[in-house]
Structures are given as C-alpha cells and as structure tokens.
Amino acid sequence: MMHQGQTMMYPSVAHPIPPQLGNVNLNMASQYPQQQQNKLVAPRKSSNIKITDPNTNKEVVLGRPSPNVAAQPQQVSGVATQPMVYYTNPQQTSYNQSGTYYSGTAGVVPTGSQGRFGYPATQAGQSIPFMNPSMSNTVPASHKDNIAGPAPSGQSQLIGKPQGGLHMEKPVPSVKISMPAGRSDASKFRVADHAVQHRQKDNEVISGAMVSNKPVSEKESKAPSIPEKHSKESKAPSAVEKHPTAVTQPLPIQAAKPETDAATANSPSFLTGADEKKESLPMTDSLKDNKKNATRNDTKNLPQQPQSASPAEELKGQTSVKLGDDVVGHMETKSFDSEKVDLTSKVSGLTSATSESSISPILGKSEADSTSVNAADVPAMVISSAKLSSASTGEPQAVESLGVAAVKSKEIEITHQISPESSDGKIMSDSTENESHDFTVDLAEQASLATSKPGNSDATSFVTDPQELPKECTTSVPEDHSLMNTSHNKDTQTLSASVDASDVSEVNSGTSSESTSQSTNDKDIRSSIQETGLAVSGITPGMLPVNHSVASEGQVKHADGAKDESSTEQSSAVPTGSVRPLSREKPTAELARTKSTAGRKKKRKEMLSKADAAGSSDLYNAYKGPQEQSESVATSDGADSSSTVDGTHVLPEESEREVMCEDDGKKKVEPDDWEDAADMSTPKLQSSDSGNQASAVQLPDSDMTEANGRKKYSRDFLLTFAHQYSSLPVGIRMDTVTSTLFKDLAGKSYVIDREPHPSSARGSDRPTSRGDRRGPAMDDDKWLKSGVPYSPNRDAHMDLTNGPAINYRGGPGGAHGVLRNPRGALLVGPQSNAPQVPRSGSDADRWQQKGLIPSPVTPMQVMHKAEKKYVVGKVSDEEQAKQRQLKAILNKLTPQNFDKLFEQVKEVNIDNVSTLTGVISQIFDKALMEPTFCEMYANFCSHLAGALPDFSEDNEKITFKRLLLNKCQEEFERGEREEAEADKTEEEGEIKQTKEEREEKRVKARRRMLGNIRLIGELYKKRMLTERIMHECIKKLLGNYQNPDEENIEALCKLMSTIGEMIDHPKAKEHMDAYFDRMRNLSTSQLISSRVRFLLRDSIDLRKNKWQQRRKVDGPKKIDEVHRDAAQERHAQSSRSRGPVVSSLPRRGAPSMDYGSRGSAAPLVSPGPQQRGRGFGNQDIRYEQERHQFDRTVPLPQRSVKDEAITLGPQGGLARGMSLRGQPPVSNSELPSVVDQRRILSGPNGYNSVPSTTREDTSSRIPDRFSGRIATAAQSASSSHRPASQEGRSGNKSYSEEELREKSIATIREYYSAKDEKEVALCIEELNAPSFYPSLVSLWVNDSFERKDMERELLAKLFVGLYNGGYNLLSKPQLIEGLSSVLASLEDALSDSPRAAEYLGRLLARFVVEKILVLQDVGKLIEEGGEEPGHLVQEGIAADVLGAVLEWIRTEKGDSFLKEAKTSSNLKLEDFRPQHLKRSKLDAFMLT
C-alpha cells in the first residue's frame, strides 16, 4: 500500500517509457529499455556464486533461518512541490528493474506550504519492510520528486528508482540496511538542493558512510523498542528521508567534538528486525550505478559539475579514506571455503563516530532451501556514494544515500530505495545525526571485490592512524570475510565515506557486542539471497553477516570539481573496522582528477604501461555461465599483494595503484549490436584481476585457439603477469603489439583525462581516454587497426551527443588527433597497412564489431600478373613509336612553329619505306580533315621531299614524290569508289540505310574529296605534281557531262580557284577554253542546284578577271603577320581620322574598313589652310538614291581613260563642271556618310586634302576602288595657295531642293565633327542657293533639338560666324525667316524633344547677346510664331521660349544687361503669358 503523500502514478502496461524524463537522470528501466543506436547488449548470463572462507578456502554455509517479519508501516512526509514521476514497467522481466513495494502508511499529507526540506526533530518514523518481489512482482513503483514531511523515528530512508539504463539488466531485489540512531547534535548537516545546480552525471556517485557514534549491546539489539535515550534522539532530523525527497548530509567531514565522542560510548547501536524503534537506512540496487559500467561511453553530454575545493582544503579537520578503483587494482578476489563461519563472532556495532557504520543486509522472506545465488539475476550491491563537498567553502553537495536496513533476530529486510531528489540521483540531507552518514549499496555494479589480507584476524583492530587514511586506498580486511568474484568483478565502484579524524581510534569499542543475535547461519542467508535475487556478486562477506561494522574509507574527491566521483563505500562489517571495496568501476577521468598533488602524477609512459596490467575486460565474466563463474571464483584463490591490500601497509607506489585502478574503469565495452552480443556470448578468455593467476588459471584450448590453430591470448590477460615476469613466455608472440603500442604511445599524442579543469565538451559519463576497453577476444594484432578512416575536419566529440553513436570517440578535452574505433582501440599515428574498407554512418559499428571473434589471418590473394604488363606511354613496336611521334608533331604544326617542328621531324629516323608511307598517310589525313591548312601541309610535304633521301626497295627507287603521287591518286579514286558504293547500296538495296545515314556518308565523302582536291592543287602550286595530272583531274571531274555530279562540279570549281592562274597559260589555252565552255553550259542547266550553278559562274568570272579574286581568302598566318596586319589597320584608321595621306590610301581591291561608330562626336583635326578642299562634306545615309546614282557614274579603273574629264562626283551634283580650265576635276572619292566620311584630296584646285569625319553608318560609304584614281590626281595637285578668284564656282550648276537639304544636313553633321566654320562656309558657297538659306537655318535648328548641348553651342557659334564672321553668307531676313519656320513646327518638335522650346530660347538669346537680333524682334517672332499667329502664346509655348531667352541672358550677361534689353525693346511680357496658365517662366521676370 502506497502512502498518499508520495503521489505515485502508475502507467499502463503498454505505456512507452522514455529512457530519461526531463532533466532528472533517475528513472526506472522500461520493460524493454530503449537501446542507443548501435548499442545493443545481450542479456547477461547467470552464474552461481560460492561463498568461501578466505582462511580455509571452504564454502561457508549460512544455515540460520530467517523468520518472517511482518511489514511495518512507514510514515511518509515530503514537500508538495513539483512532482517528478518515475515510471517503470509493471511487468518484471529479465530486462527491467524490480519494483519497490510499500505497505500502507499513515502520515501527514504534504502541503504546498511545507518547506522543501522539512525534517522536524520530533518526527518519528517507521522503516519500510522488504517485500519479496518474487511473490508480488506485478506492482510497479513510482515516486514523486519533492515530498517532505515528518521523518521516521531515528532513521532516514532514501527511496528512489534507479535510472532505466540502456543496457539490459536482470531484475534485482531491494535492500534495506538499518542503521542505529545517534545523537542529533553530533554533527550538523547542511541541506543543499543540488538539483538546481549543475546536473550530476547519473552514473557517478560518491558515497559517504553514515556511521553510528555509539556501541550497541546485544540485548538492546534484540529489544523490541529503542531505549529512551535513543528514542529521544530519534526525533532529531534524520539523515535520510524514506521518501524519494529525503536528503542527507553533504558530508562535510568534520572532527567530532569531545562531547560527541563521549556520547558515542553510551549510545545504543543495534540493528533490529522490524520494530519501529530501529534506525534504518534503506539501501538500493541502483541500476543507475549499475549502468555506469555499460554507459561510460554512451553518447550523453551532461553538464559539468562546479569545481569544488582542492583535496587539501577538504582534508582540513577531517579524515577521509578513499576506497575503490585505487584498491581494486591490487585486490584479489577470494573464495570461501566450504566450512562454516561463525557469524556471531564477527558481528560488530556501528561504533565509529564519523565513518564507521553497521550494514546489516538481512535477507527477507524467502525460500530457505535455496542454496545458490545467481549472479546474473541480481547485480552486485554497491554502497551508493555521497556527494562530498569542500569543507573550506561549505558548499552542500548532493548525496545519494541509502539507509542501513534494520535487522531483527535472524531476519534481513532488504528494501530497494533511492531518492531522486536531485536530478541525477544525488540525495541531500539536513539531518544532524553524526552517526547517520549514509552510503549506498549498489546491487548492480559490483564486480570485483577485494578480500582481507590473511593473517589479520584481530577482531577488534581498527584503523588507528587517521592521517594515513586519506593517503591509502584501502585498509586491512580480516581473513574470514572474503569477497565473491562475479560477472562484474571488474566493474565495481569505489567507496568513499567521510571519517572523523578524532573518532577513528574509537572504532574498536563495542563493535561485536550485539552482533551475535543478529547474525544468521550461512545456509539461511544463502537461501535468502537466492530467493530474493540479491546479488551476492560484489558483496563483501561483511554485508551478509549481521552488524558488520564498516570503517569506510573515502578519499576526498573532486580535486578539480569537474564531476561527481562515482565512488561507493564498502561496508565490510568486520570487527577490525577494515574497509573493502564493493566495486571497481571508476572512470579514468574521475580517477585522474583525484590526483591533485604533484607527487601522485607519474610520467605518461609509466602510467600507461602499468594501467594495462589491471586486468582484462569485464565482458569475459559478463557472459560466463554458472560453471565458469564458479571456476573463476575457485581459481581466484590465494591472494597476493596486487589484489589483497592490508590497511596497515601502504603500497610502495600509490601512483601505481591509481593507474591500475584507472585502468579498471575502462575495461568494460558494451557491444553495439545484438549480433555482436551474440558473438560475445561465448567467452574466449577467462581472466581475473589477480596479478598472479598465471599458475592458477587454466583455460581450455578452445577458448584460446585461433582459427589457424595457434593459441592466442589477449593483451589484457598477458599484462596481468607484468609484475611477475619481466620477459614474455616462450611461444607467445607479442613483439608486434609491444613495438607498435609502446612506440606510438610513448612518442605521440595519447589522450589521458588528467586535466584539472576539463573542457565543457566533456559529455560522456565514462570518458573514453584510454584504448583498453576492448572485446575479450580482440586480436592483439588488430588492436590498433581501425577500418574507419580519420577525417581531420571531423569533430572528435560529435558522438557524445544524444544522436547516433559514431565510431569516433575523442577524449574529453584531450588531443583531437587521437580517435578511437568502436571497440575503444586507439587510433594513434599511421594506421594499419592492411587493406581496409572505409565505412561511415550507422553501419560502421556493426561492420567493425564483427571482429570480436578473431578471424583467421589469410594472405591477400595475389592478382594475376601478365607476362607483358601494359605500361602507359610505352610502345613495344619501334615503328609504332615513330608514327606516334610524327603524329604528335603534326598536331602541333602551325605556320609559326613550322621550322622548329620540321627539325624535329628530321630527327625522327625515317629510314624505310614503311615509315615514309606512314608519314604521308598522316599528312593526308590531317589535310583532308582540315582543308584550311592544306597550304601549310603542302609546304610541309615540299620540305620533306627535299630533306628525305631516296629509298630502294626490290631494286626499285622510291622517292617521297612518288609515294605522294600514289597517295593522291589513291585518295582521288577512293572518292569515286565511295560514291559508287553509295549509289550501289542505294540502287540494289543490299545494305539498307536510312536517309540520314546516307546523307551523312555523302557529306563525309564530299568533305574528304574537297580536301583532297585542294591539297592536290596546293601540291601542284608547290611543283610537287605535274600539270598533266591536273588536266587529268579536271577531265575526270567534267567527264559526266550529260548527268553531272554536283560533288564533282564543286570539286572542279575548288580546283580551278586553286590552280587556275598557273594552269591558264597560252599553251593550255585550248584546253582551258574547252573546260570553261562546258562549265558555262552547266551554269545554265537546271539539272543541278542553284548553289552549284553560282559556283560555276564565279569560276567563269574569276577567269575573266584574270584570276583576281574579289576577296582574298586568308589562310593560316604567323603571329608576326597577324600583328603586322593589325598594325596596318590601326595606322589606316588613324590616317583616316586625320585625313587621308597619299601613301596611306588603300589601293584598289583592298578590303574596306569601317571605323565609324554611331553617335560619335569626337572632333577631327582641322586641316591647315592649304589642305582645305572643296566639297560638301558628308552624305546622309538616308539618301540611297543619290549613292546609287554616284556608283553608276563612276567608271571602272581598268577602263581606258580618255582625254575628256571624268567626273568622280554624282551625276548632276555640285562636283560637275567644277574643274578649272578643263583640268581633271576635283571630287570626293567617297561621298560623306553618316558614320565614316573621308575628305579626299582635291585635284588641281590647289587643295591637297579635306578632313574626314566619322559618321553613324558604314553602308553608305563609297567603295575604295575609287581611291586609286583620286590618289593619282592628288599626286599632281598643287599645294601652293588658294586661288584668289572665285571663278571656279560654277553658277550654272543648280541642285534640287531635296539635294540641297541632303547636302545641308551632311554639312552640319560634318561641322559637328570637324568644328570647322570655314569648311561649312565653303560648302554653303558651293551650294550657291541663297534662297535655300532660310530652309538651311530651319533644318539645322530642328536638327539641333536632338543634339547635345555642345553641338547646339557649336551651331549658335556657326550662325554668328556665318552672319558677321566675314563670310556674309546669311542675312538677317534669311535668319529670321528660318527661325519663323522653326517656330511654326515647334509644337510638333516638342513631341519628339520636350525641351525644344528651351533650346530654341537659348539660341535666340545668343542672337540677342551677339546683337544679331534685338529682343523686340525675338518677341515678335515668338508672338507671331506657330501654325497660326498667336498660336504659341495660346498654348503657352511662347512663354516658355521667351522665359528661356531671358533666363539665358541674365545668366550670361547679368540683370543689368537684361534690364537694358527689356527697356530698349519695350517688350510687354504679359502679352506672352496666357491667362489659363497658373505658373510660367515669365513670372520671375514680370516682377522686375
């Protein structure tokens, strides 16, 4: 029956239980605990445990029966704060933890107003009896987190649920250990809620032993009630609350006061069975602690603990004894003999004032006839650790404490209770009971227990030197209390308990006075142990007899404060007060941090070498059967110094013990897969922690035999003999492992977690700092081998999160260069040379774990080796090597490196016909596929013909030319043959081909034939072939006259264009005429395509033009030629920009060049006064008709030049009749175009050249073929002076209005480029049309609206110059008329140029400023302007124009000039402003 205040909640059977609830690290294991990824562990096998006497090595028979004791109700109190519920599966199986059962209780229901840790001194409580889970194993247990209330009388019980671990455990019973009450004022305990601090790791606990200060008499122990004195003291705040919210003291180790010491002599200390007056402290089977071994490497990043004070500070005024891994490494498990042990003589009271406490693990109701204990069913009991705090700082630390079960006359009540007050199971207490130092008995973690040193049989001897206790790991243990070796003999935890320095010597008083009545016989205890499932494994014999006192030793940990040290306190319950470790499991990182003094630190190499001697992995014992376990226990007989430690003798080197203890914490390796667990279920080696078991352990050959038949021993097992043997035994090969291991470890980075301030990246509960945790059957050769490649960019701590476990597990804060494989093998330095298959991801662990059972080492299969292996670039045939070399040269052949590569060809030994034929074939192949380079390849053949010698074969002279000719004939005939084959397949249909395939084949054949024809022609030009061969080729191509083949005709045209000039000579005139007559007939035939007909016509025209091609087909050029041509183009461009020079004019037939760009306004260099020519500048591109007319009137250069003058200008243009006295006319070689205008040199009129301009288009440029004659005329021109008379002007020539418009536009555009007013004046004079001048002004002004401001400024300047610049070409009436025309079309111009009114106003203002017009004239023009008079005023355009005029005048001349102009003009601005306009530019000028 569960008390209501506990607020327990029970989930349904099918409720999925998460592995961890919230931030609390305490929870119950689910029925099937959730496994971490790649962390699957098979259930452990059970094994029987024999309890033997260490002196006689005989089995101890515990035959005293344990009467049934009725369950006593327990009053529960707590704090009604935030409840924390821990779930467990109600179904008890082999995978979950057994539940805790409570009887009905009566107490005060907790309220929210109660204090979090309210423990009234007057409260009395009752112990919770143990209920056999085997009888009622269906009731789950849950606990609330924060419950406080009246504490039980004189006792504190700590009830909690172990955390549901990820690895599978057998169900274990609850253990209740009662402890006598002591004085309430013995020591003041501080209460600290460590849950609000950093979370403690759930598997690291430090236990402190709650020791009673007063001896207990046998009579009192049997009494049903506690004496009055003790009853009063029981009302004091108890050390540990029964409820999970109960807390205990942080164990500040203080020296007991004198009055406390005095009181301890009279304090009753007894262990009763079930009465309410006994002082009990529950003990738990902490699955959380048991999980330490399995989850040291689990990927759980937990917060770090705050660092506590140094050990020196903690040891001030106190004495602590460290017990655990430091001792376990040197302790040897012992077996009991079969003889019975009188437990009555070995009962001791809890007399130590500080660290002495009696643990009476009394078995509850069970079947008394059971005679064996299954070690796998119930893990070992471990005394839960208490969180030690620094005495200097006084910080309260959470303590996970378990009470001492009460014992009453042959009954053992075991209660499995733990308090989850803190997030990780650390329990805090505010009790002031000095004798209530609590400690935890872990039923799941004990593996290897050390026995007492033989010879120490003094039942009353205690540790008397309080100063020696902190230094030593262990104290002496009596012989008659041995430890049992179980499957977890290596994974035990250290015990830590505070010892009062002043009360250590008082332990020997009254320890065994009350022990007789409470002890049970051997047989009954054994049967009870089996029935209740109590794991005797890891339990000292002192825990089985009644009232065995414990001199708990605990070395103050937290030297660096990084973590809670997982040390538990052993209650050996011996009269001598000796202390035994119950567990050995301790992380290496924790052990390293306990070494705060420099004297304890040794060299790295020494520590590593000694750490390996601590023993083999616990996986051997984890999967042993009962028989194997018994054998292991039997063979662990005979303790020596390495395993049995006498408390009175300090080991020679404490660092050696620490290193060996450190190694123990790393032996445990959990398989990552269920397959691996199955593989590991068969043990390969049976090892022990004993250092001298070489002679005792006899392993069967099957366990040590490799697949190859040789015996193989694990490295850990062999290192157990390090203390006895200095050399290896004969027949064992360790040279490879030893040299590899110690060489790498000594000289390279090796991760040892010894830093005093660990990094925050430390997240694993058991740091993987050492590489010793390997599978039991791990092959030594493969220890350092890893199939997982190391990635330098990979985070070594990436698998320390809650995500999937990756193979890389770096040491916490250690060197990142050291990684470890899934089995813990250390990856140091270069990895194995053996071929590895790199794997990553979730399958990596599974693949790597397959090697737990070593596989036979087989040599790698040798690949087949060819007799003649292939070597890249190596050619066995010499001829083939030559051909490859020649092909490489041809591939790099260019006109630029022609000479150099030809020298390389000559270096190739071409000494036979075969090589020469191959060279010719390669040249033809390159030429046919690259027709552009046929000329170069022909040149190459010409050079080869002269360089290569003649060869003789079969008395026949063979030359390069002969072979070349044969190749040409072969290729020529090949083309015909391919065409015939194509026709044949098409006609007969022997090979069915699609149309696309036939077309592709024809194209390929035609391309090859054309290349061949062109190469033949180029070879003929190099005189490599004869003329007769060329005629034969032509006849062949023209042979089929009636049904011509287009490919042949195309090849003929190509051949004619190549060799026509050479073959067309007088001797071959008849043949050539016949050829071209036939070609002329074919050009008009409709049987061939138009493309081929035009090819024929081009060939005919080419012969008429004396084989002068219209455009030169440029072939490959040298780099120098390319640079030279580019320089010539640049030079020609610059010459055209300045004006043509005689030497730079292109000759007839030269390619035309365009240098103009649209919109270019770059000024051209104005020619000198003696370089001005006459003409009208540029011709607009828009007037194509005039250009065509000009082309028709220009005679061709080859025509005979008659005596009459030749007009080079357009017909009817101004150039006609402009020659002086019948001399050759002056003309423009090229009419000005919009883009590229050239002012060509004039004739005998005295002007050498005219400037050229760049215009907007190139299409209207006159062909360059006219420049030749102009250059001739320019050479005879005189450059003396400008003639004085104007007789040269032709008054008879007149132009149409359209022509005048064109010329005027061309002139102004030329002016914008050249900026030469005189040239414009000359052009206007040439026009000789004064009536056209108003139109010219209108055209120029309208054109300026789309120009830039600079060009508009040039136009205004030009008008001023033409009006009063000495030219007198424009008059005022002409100017006003032109401006009126502009105003008439201004409204339309505004649609194209919105700022046209402003531009016009600026021009008019310029006329006013230059005094060409007065402001009154301007006003009149604006007022009367428009399509109709006054229209601009109505539209508001007049106001904009006049406002722009006035604005510009004021800007340029100032207000005074503007005012004077306004005054003189009598202009009324109001007349120009329409009434409907709200705002106008005139508004600013109307006010002044």
UniProtKB/Swiss-Prot annotation:
The keyword Ribonucleoprotein does not apply. Residues 883-1106 form the MIF4G domain. Keywords: Initiation factor, Protein biosynthesis, Translation regulation. Residues 978-989 have a biased composition (Acidic residues). Residues 300-310, 345-360, 448-464, 473-495, 627-646, 683-696, 1273-1294 have a biased composition (Polar residues). Residues 709-721 are annotated as: EIF4E-binding. Pfam families: MA3, MIF4G. Residues 216-244, 274-299, 555-566, 651-671, 753-784, 990-1000, 1111-1132, 1181-1191, 1254-1267 have a biased composition (Basic and acidic residues). GO terms for cellular component: eukaryotic translation initiation factor 4F complex. Residues 196-320, 337-367, 415-707, 753-795, 974-1000, 1107-1299 are annotated as: Disordered. It comes from the Eukaryota. InterPro entries: ARM-type_fold, Initiation_fac_eIF4g_MI, MIF4G-like_typ-3. Residues 496-520 have a biased composition (Low complexity). EIF4F is a multi-subunit complex, the composition of which varies with external and internal environmental conditions. It is composed of at least EIF4A, EIF4E and EIF4G. In higher plants two isoforms of EIF4F have been identified, named isoform EIF4F and isoform EIF(iso)4F. Isoform EIF4F has subunits p220 and p26, whereas isoform EIF(iso)4F has subunits p82 and p28. Component of the protein complex eIF4F, which is involved in the recognition of the mRNA cap, ATP-dependent unwinding of 5'-terminal secondary structure and recruitment of mRNA to the ribosome. This is Eukaryotic translation initiation factor 4G. It comes from Triticum aestivum (Wheat). The lineage of its organism: Eukaryota, Viridiplantae, Streptophyta, Embryophyta, Tracheophyta.
